[in-house]
C-alpha cells in the first residue's frame, strides 16, 4: 500500500513539476527574448555611441587644431617680442605699418602706456598677423588675435576678419577669464584657458583660447584668439537627430544645439569621468559625455530614448506577443497534459489503491488461503492469515517440493498431506508483483472433500451393487411373473379360438381382460424401472406415422364403440409419409393417452388430431371426460400420482402411465403438455421432431377435380377437416340446405339420412361403424369417423377412379394367412418349462405350423440332427445349455435357419444379448397369437424364398 501511496504522491509531484517545467520553459523563452532585445538594444547603443564618438572626434579635432594654432601664434609672438622690456627687435617694415586697436579690460587699465612701450613690437606683430592672415588664417578659420599685457591689462586687438563683435559680452567674458587666470594657483598659471561665448543664433558662438607668453621666464602678456564655432560642424553627415552641448568644468552649459528634448542638464557623476556613456535619470535620453583636452571643456551628445528604441520597438512587441502566445500555449499544453495524463493517472492510481485495498480485504476475508510466493526461492511475500496457518503446517520437504514445482512451471496444482493429516490442495498461477516473478497460490483444505469423495465412492459402489441387485430383481420378477402369466394368457387366447358353451365365453372374456390388465400393470412397472435405471433405449428407424395412427385407431375403435363413444381421427394432408423415430414407443405413448381418454370419458367423443407444427409432428388427444383440477395438473406426470380420491376409486391403474409417457417423449427429443378443465375434458398434446421427414406430393386426384360434394355435417371439426381434405383432392364442397343436387353429386352427412338422396351417392359418417367403408344400400355408404382421411379413396371408388398407392393411406401390414397354409413349415420349440412348451406347440398348431419340441439346448441339437427343421423357437434361460449357447452352436454348425428367442426378461439388455448371440429376433413373454403370427410369417416367407 505504501508503494501505491508513493506512486500516487509521485504522480502529484510530477504534475507540479510539469507545471514548474512549463513555467521554466516560459521563463527561459522570456529570458532569451529579453536577452535578444537587450542585445539588440546594446547593439543599437553601440551604433549610437559609435556615431557619438565620430562626432566627438570632430569636436576634439577642432579643439586640438585651435590649440595647435595657439602654439604657433605663441611661438610667433615670443619671436617678435624682444627680451628687453618687452620690445621687439627692429626690422625692416612697411611704411604703412598699422598699429592694432587697444581696449582697456579694467577701469585702471593704461592702454597709452602699453601702446608707447610696445609700439614697435605690436607693429611688427601686426604686420606678421596681416601676413599670416593673408596666407594662412583662412585655413584656421580665426576671427581675431589679441594680446593682453600682464601689467597694464590692456588688450591689443589684431582683427583678422570683419566680424561683428558683441563688445560687452566679449569683454565681460575676457575679464572673467583673466581674473580666473590671475587667481589660479601657481601650478595652473601656465595652462591655457578655453571658453565659449554664445552667439546670436543657437548653436553658433565664439571659441576663445588664451595662453601666456613668457620672456625670460617672466610673464609678459596673454595671447588669445577668437574663433567662430558652429555646433552643427560637430555632427557626422547623416547622423541621428541628436543634441550636442559643450559644458565647462563645472558642468555649466556654454553652447548647445539641442535635440527634441531641450538642453541637457549635467549630472555630477558625468563630471568625474573623462568619458561617460549612459542614460539620464528617468531614462529619457542616451548621453555621451567626453572631455576635450587640452581644454577643460566637455562635449555632451544626447538622443531621446524613443529614437534608441525606434528600431527595436517592433522587436519588443513581437517578443511580448511571442511570450504571451508561448505562455498561453504552455499553459494550455500543461492543462491538457494534466487532464489527459496526470489527472487520469492519479485517478487510476487512486482506483488502483482502492483495488489494492479491496483485494487485500478480499484476500484477508477469503475462506481459502491465498498467498504470493517468490518463484526463485519460494519466500512468502504476501498472505492472509489462513494461508499463513496452512504454510506453517507444511514440512520442510513439502516446502522444497512446492518451490521446485513453482520454478518448474510444469503443473498448476499439487496435493499435500500435512503433518497433522490435513489434505491441502495448492493451486497457483504465475504473475509479476512489484517487479518480481511470483506465483499466486491458493491453499484449500480439501480434507472434507476427500472424505466426501471417499464416502461418495463407497456410495457409488453401493449404488452399483444396488443397481445390479435391482437389475437382477427386475430380471427375476420379469421372468417369474411373465412365465406363469404366459401360461394363463396363452391358454385363454387358445380357448377363445374354440367354440364355447353359452355363458362360458363371458367368463373367458373376463379372465382375459383381467390377465391383460395384470400384464399391463407389470409392463408399466418394468418400463418405469428400466427408464429410471437408464436401461430403456430408444430404437429409431424409418416408419410411417399414418400407419401407426391407423393401427392405433383400429385397435381401440372396438373399445370406443363398446362404450358408445366416438373416436375421430384427423390426419392432416401435410403429415409426412415417413420419418425417423421409434414407432413402438410412439405407439405406446399414444395408446396410453388414448386408453386414459377412453377410461375417463363416459359421454361424448375422443378426437385424435395429427398435424405438422413447424419442425415438429404434433399429435393431440382430446376427450370430453371428467377433466382434471388445475392444482393437480402440475403433478400429473409424477410417478404413482393419481387424480383425486373419487377418480382413484372409480378407475384402476398404477399412476405410472403418464410418467412413462413423459419420459419416453423426452427421450425422443419431444415434449408433452396438458390442458384440462374439470367437467369439460382434457387435451394432451405431444410433439416429436421431424427427423428425416419425407412429405407427400401435393396433387389432386385425377377424376375428382370438378366434382361436387354437399356437406350436411353437424360436427364443426369434422366438417372443416372434410372441406380441407377434399379441397386438396380438387373436390368442390358446399353446405347442403335442401338444394336440388345434380346427378353426379355426393352427399356427406354425419347422421342418418332423412330422405333418399337423388344424387350419385351418399356417405354417412357413423361413430359406431368399425372397419372399411361399406355400401349398406345402393348409393348409401357408411364410413368410420376414425378414418376420415380415407374419404378421397372412397370417393374415387364411388366414381370408379383408380388411385396410386401413394394417394391412399394403408393400415399396418398384416399377414392374412389361413391355418392350412403353414403346414409346410416345421418349427422346433425349445423350452424347459413343460406348460410353456406345450402352450407354444398348441399356438403354433392353431396357426397351422408343424411342430417338434425339445427340453433344452442339448436335446434341441439332437432333434436338429435327426429332423429337417425350418425355424427354431427357443427359450433363452434353460438348464444344461441355454438359448444363447444353442444359437451359437447352430451357427457354428453352419446352419442359417431362423432362430427366434423367447424370454421372460423384458430388459433391453436381454434382447440385445439375444441378437448378439446370433438370434434373428426375440419375443417377450407372454407371447400372444398376433405377435407370434406376425413374427413367424416374416421368417416363413424367407424360408420359402430360400427353398425356391
Curated annotation (Swiss-Prot):
Domain Histidine kinase: 476-692
Domain called Response regulatory: residue spans: 826-940
Single Gene Ontology BP annotation: regulation of DNA-templated transcription
Signal peptide feature range: none
Catalytic reactions on record: ATP + protein L-histidine = ADP + protein N-phospho-L-histidine
One GO CC term, this protein: plasma membrane
Enzyme class: transferase
Function comment: Component of the Rcs signaling system, which controls transcription of numerous genes. RcsC functions as a membrane-associated protein kinase that phosphorylates RcsD in response to environmental signals. The phosphoryl group is then transferred to the response regulator RcsB.
Entry protein name: Sensor histidine kinase RcsC
UniProt organism field: Salmonella typhi
Gene, per the UniProt record: rcsC
Amino acid at each position: 500500500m505504501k508503494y501505491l501511496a508513493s506512486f500516487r504522491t509521485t504522480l502529484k509531484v510530477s504534475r507540479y513539476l510539469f507545471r514548474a517545467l512549463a513555467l521554466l520553459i516560459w521563463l527561459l523563452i522570456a529570458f532569451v527574448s529579453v536577452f535578444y532585445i537587450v542585445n539588440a538594444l546594446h547593439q543599437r547603443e553601440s551604433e549610437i555611441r559609435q556615431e557619438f564618438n565620430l562626432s566627438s572626434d570632430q569636436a576634439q579635432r577642432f579643439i586640438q587644431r585651435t590649440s595647435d594654432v595657439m602654439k604657433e601664434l605663441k611661438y610667433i609672438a615670443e619671436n617678435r617680442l624682444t627680451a628687453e622690456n618687452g620690445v621687439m627687435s627692429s626690422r625692416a617694415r612697411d611704411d604703412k605699418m598699422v598699429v592694432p586697436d587697444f581696449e582697456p579690460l579694467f577701469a585702471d587699465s593704461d592702454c597709452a602706456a602699453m601702446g608707447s612701450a610696445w609700439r614697435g613690437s605690436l607693429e611688427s606683430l601686426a604686420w606678421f598677423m596681416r601676413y599670416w592672415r593673408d596666407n594662412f588664417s583662412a585655413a584656421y578659420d580665426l576671427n581675431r588675435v589679441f594680446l593682453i599685457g600682464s601689467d597694464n591689462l590692456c588688450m591689443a586687438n589684431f582683427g583678422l576678419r570683419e566680424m561683428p563683435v558683441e563688445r560687452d559680452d566679449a569683454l565681460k567674458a575676457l575679464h572673467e577669464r583673466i581674473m580666473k587666470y590671475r587667481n589660479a594657483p601657481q601650478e595652473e598659471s601656465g595652462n591655457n584657458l578655453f571658453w565659449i561665448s554664445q552667439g546670436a543664433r543657437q548653436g553658433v558662438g565664439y571659441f576663445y583660447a588664451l595662453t601666456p607668453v613668457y620672456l625670460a621666464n617672466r610673464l609678459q602678456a596673454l595671447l588669445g584668439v577668437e574663433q567662430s564655432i558652429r555646433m552643427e560642424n560637430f555632427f557626422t553627415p547623416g547622423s541621428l537627430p541628436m543634441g550636442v552641448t559643450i559644458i565647462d568644468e563645472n558642468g555649466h552649459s556654454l553652447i548647445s544645439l539641442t535635440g527634441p528634448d531641450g538642453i541637457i542638464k549635467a549630472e555630477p557623476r558625468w563630471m568625474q569621468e573623462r568619458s561617460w556613456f549612459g542614460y539620464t535619470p528617468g531614462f529619457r535620453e542616451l548621453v555621451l559625455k567626453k572631455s576635450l583636452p587640452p581644454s577643460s571643456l566637455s562635449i555632451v551628445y544626447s538622443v531621446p530614448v524613443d529614437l534608441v528604441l525606434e528600431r527595436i520597438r517592433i522587436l519588443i512587441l513581437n517578443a511580448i506577443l511571442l511570450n504571451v502566445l508561448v505562455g498561453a500555449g504552455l499553459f494550455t499544453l500543461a492543462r491538457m497534459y494534466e487532464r489527459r495524463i496526470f489527472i487520469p493517472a492519479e485517478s487510476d492510481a487512486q482506483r488502483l489503491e482502492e483495488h489494492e485495498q479491496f483485494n487485500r480485504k478480499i484476500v484477508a476475508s477469503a475462506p481459502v488461503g491465498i498467498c504470493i510466493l517468490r518463484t526463485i526461492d519460494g519466500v512468502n511475500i504476501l498472505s492472509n492469515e489462513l494461508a499463513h496457518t496452512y504454510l506453517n503446517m507444511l514440512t520442510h520437504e513439502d516446502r522444497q517440493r512446492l518451490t521446485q514445482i513453482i520454478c518448474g512451471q510444469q503443473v498448476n496444482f499439487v496435493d499435500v498431506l500435512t503433518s497433522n493429516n490435513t489434505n491441502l490442495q495448492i493451486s497457483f498461477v504465475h504473475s509479476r508483483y512489484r517487479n518480481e516473478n511470483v506465483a499466486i497460490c491458493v491453499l484449500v483444505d480439501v480434507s472434507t472433500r476427500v472424505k466426501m469423495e471417499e464416502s461418495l465412492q463407497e456410495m457409488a459402489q453401493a449404488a452399483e451393487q444396488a443397481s445390479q441387485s435391482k437389475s437382477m430383481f427386475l430380471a427375476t420378477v420379469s421372468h417369474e411373473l411373465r412365465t406363469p402369466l404366459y401360461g394363463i394368457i396363452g391358454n385363454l387366447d387358445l380357448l377363445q379360438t374354440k367354440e364355447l358353451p353359452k355363458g362360458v365365453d363371458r367368463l373367458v372374456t373376463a379372465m382375459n381382460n383381467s390377465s391383460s390388465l395384470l400384464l399391463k400393470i407389470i409392463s408399466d412397472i418394468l418400463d418405469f424401472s428400466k427408464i429410471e435405471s437408464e436401461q430403456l433405449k430408444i430404437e429409431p428407424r424409418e416408419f410411417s406415422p399414418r400407419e401407426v395412427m391407423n393401427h392405433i385407431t383400429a385397435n381401440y375403435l372396438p373399445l370406443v364403440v363398446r362404450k358408445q363413444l366416438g373416436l375421430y381421427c384427423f390426419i392432416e394432408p401435410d403429415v409426412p409419409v415417413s420419418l425417423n423415430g421409434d414407432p413402438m414407443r410412439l405407439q405406446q405413448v399414444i395408446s396410453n393417452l388414448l386408453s386414459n381418454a377412453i377410461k375417463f370419458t363416459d359421454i361424448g367423443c375422443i378426437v385424435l388430431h395429427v398435424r405438422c407444427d413447424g419442425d415438429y409432428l404434433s399429435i393431440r388427444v382430446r376427450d370430453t371426460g371428467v377433466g382434471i383440477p388445475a392444482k393437480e395438473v402440475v403433478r400429473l406426470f409424477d410417478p404413482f400420482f393419481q387424480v383425486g380420491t373419487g377418480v382413484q376409486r372409480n378407475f384402476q391403474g398404477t399412476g405410472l402411465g403418464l410418467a412413462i409417457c413423459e419420459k419416453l417423449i423426452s427421450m425422443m427429443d419431444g415434449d408433452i403438455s396438458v390442458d384440462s378443465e374439470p367437467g369439460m375434458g382434457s387435451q394432451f398434446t405431444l410433439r416429436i421432431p421431424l427427423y428425416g421427414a419425407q412429405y407427400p406430393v401435393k396433387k389432386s386426384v385425377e377424376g375428382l377435380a370438378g366434382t361436387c360434394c354437399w356437406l350436411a355435417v353437424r360436427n364443426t371439426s369434422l366438417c372443416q377437416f372434410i372441406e380441407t381434405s377434399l379441397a386438396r383432392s380438387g373436390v368442390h364442397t358446399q353446405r347442403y340446405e335442401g338444394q336440388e343436387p345434380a346427378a353426379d353429386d355426393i352427399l356427406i352427412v354425419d347422421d342418418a339420412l332423412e330422405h333418399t338422396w337423388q344424387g350419385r351417392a351418399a356417405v354417412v359418417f357413423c361413430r359406431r361403424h368399425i372397419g372399411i367403408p361399406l355400401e349398406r344400400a345402393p348409393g348409401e355408404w357408411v364410413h368410420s369417423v376414425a378414418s376420415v382421411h380415407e374419404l378421397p379413396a372412397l370417393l374415387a371408388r364411388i366414381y370408379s377412379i383408380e388411385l396410386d398407392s401413394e394417394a391412399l393411406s394403408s393400415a399396418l401390414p398384416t399377414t392374412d394367412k389361413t391355418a392350412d397354409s403353414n403346414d409346410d413349415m416345421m418349427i422346433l420349440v425349445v423350452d424347459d418349462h413343460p406348460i410353456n412348451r406345450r402352450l407354444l406347440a398348441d399356438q403354433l398348431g392353431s396357426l397351422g405350423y408343424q411342430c417338434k419340441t425339445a427340453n433344452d439346448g442339448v436335446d434341441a441339437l439332437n432333434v436338429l440332427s435327426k429332423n429337417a427343421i425350418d425355424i427354431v423357437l427357443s427359450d433363452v434361460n434353460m438348464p444344461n445349455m441355454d438359448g444363447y449357447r444353442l444359437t451359437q452352436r447352430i451357427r457354428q454348425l453352419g446352419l442359417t435357419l431362423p432362430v427366434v428367442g423367447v424370454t421372460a426378461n423384458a430388459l433391453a439388455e436381454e434382447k440385445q444379448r439375444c441378437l448378439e448371440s446370433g438370434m434373428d429376433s426375440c419375443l417377450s413373454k407372454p407371447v400372444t397369437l398376433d405377435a407370434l403370427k406376425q413374427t413367424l410369417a416374416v421368417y416363413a416367407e424367407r424360408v420359402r424364398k430360400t427353398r425356391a
